[in-house]
């Protein structure tokens, strides 16, 4: 059942919305040549729009809830181990990407850029070169 759910929630739409699959070693090698400043610019100008478009395409609307669902689907389909802990109104994430500090910064930047549009934000963030953890709360 879970494999079928994953397929319908992300893989089914990935090609339609312009996402491609890359191996971790390839992505890690590319990211090692990208500055944090450049990655932040890319995250806000390009990737923010792509994630918003993906969410609208998959769920028909962009809300905090549909964005969080598409984030979960994207992480799962990308085989990036993560935990999403729902605690009342707070969503807590622990993401073990193993793709370097630049990717940690990328994740937090793109997620925060979208959340800010809804008066939500990331806080209590901890970034390492292997993982990122944060909470999502209303501002």
Annotated model-derived regions:
Residues 73-130:
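Short, hydrophobic/π-rich interface segment
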Residues 127-139:
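Beta-rich nucleic-acid/ligand-interaction surfaces
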Residues 1-86:
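N-terminal accessory segment detector
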């Amino acid at each position: 059942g879970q494999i079928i759910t994953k397929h319908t929630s992300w893989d089914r739409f990935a090609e339609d919305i312009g996402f491609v699959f890359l191996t971790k070693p390839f992505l890690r090698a590319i990211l090692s040549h990208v500055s944090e400043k450049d990655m932040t610019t890319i995250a806000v100008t390009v990737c923010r729009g792509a994630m918003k478009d993906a969410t609208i395409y998959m769920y028909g609307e962009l809300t905090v809830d549909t964005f969080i669902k598409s984030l979960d689907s994207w992480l799962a389909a990308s085989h990036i181990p993560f935990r999403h802990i729902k605690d009342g109104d707070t969503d807590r994430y622990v993401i073990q990407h193993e793709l370097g500090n630049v990717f940690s910064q990328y994740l937090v930047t793109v997620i925060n850029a979208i959340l800010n549009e809804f008066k939500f934000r990331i806080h209590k963030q901890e970034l390492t070169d292997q993982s990122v953890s944060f909470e999502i709360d209303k501002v």
